[in-house]
């Protein structure tokens, strides 16, 4: 599988703006900038690379966990994961996941075991 994103940046670091376009069409010319990286007080839609990394990890983790649960004969009704990315001194320090799930007939211990398996085998986890 090959996935492509096009990123365009115009201008200098502080005042420039950019646009992200996904091959899939999920977003087209989504704006990003230094201002949306750290604050977005103007109410304009925008994102930043760190937010996209957190979203990719949470989404990939949920999908992987769903498959891991299915392989163990559990059917999730809902998996809800928050990803909190810590960005300090110009570097990503960590990404923490907070998971809540609705899965019938599973013990807390088994759910945690399978969630850890999914975390360890999620393709996005492997690059972070």
Question: Across the structure, where does each feature detected by a protein language model lie?
Answer:
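Extended beta-strand/beta-hairpin segments
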Residues: 1-55, 62-128
